[in-house]
Amino acid sequence: MINIEQRGARQVVLVLDQLVARMDDMSPALAEIGEDLVESMKGRFASAKAPDGTPWAPNSPVTITAYLGLFKGSHKKDGSLSKKGQQRAASKKPGTGETKALQTTINYQLESNDTVSVGSPLVYAAMFNFGGTREKFPNLWGDIPAREFAGVSDADRENILEIVGSYLLGA
């Protein structure tokens, strides 16, 4: 004959009640996830790599020329690049203009107790992330390659799981 005794059943019920209450309001965990994803996405501008680690397409010669035109001393009198201009051109990463507007406007917003959105409010953020062709967008001066910054990397996924696990367990 098997005899089953209940020991600590109240504690189990209490822990389960706390777990259910935490699941009803995930906003603290989502806020932490949002903050971490914002930093991760901003970091992609420094590395010039997509969430999967692939490098972004380099700047076009037209972009480099326009960028160098912002600075005095980029060109010699004969029109060739000065040493300073060469250094500027070599160090220019995609999406890192003088204002750094795109990377500095990445933010998160809690939409509800179970949803967080992360991105940039800038109109051109989607074009930067997904790219576009003149065929689909006739107003473009040329095709724009995708330079994915918005997304979740493997490291981000692991971090999200850790945050959710810690939050649900009350750690």
Annotate the PLM regions.
Residues M1-A171:
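Short, Lys/Arg-rich flexible segments
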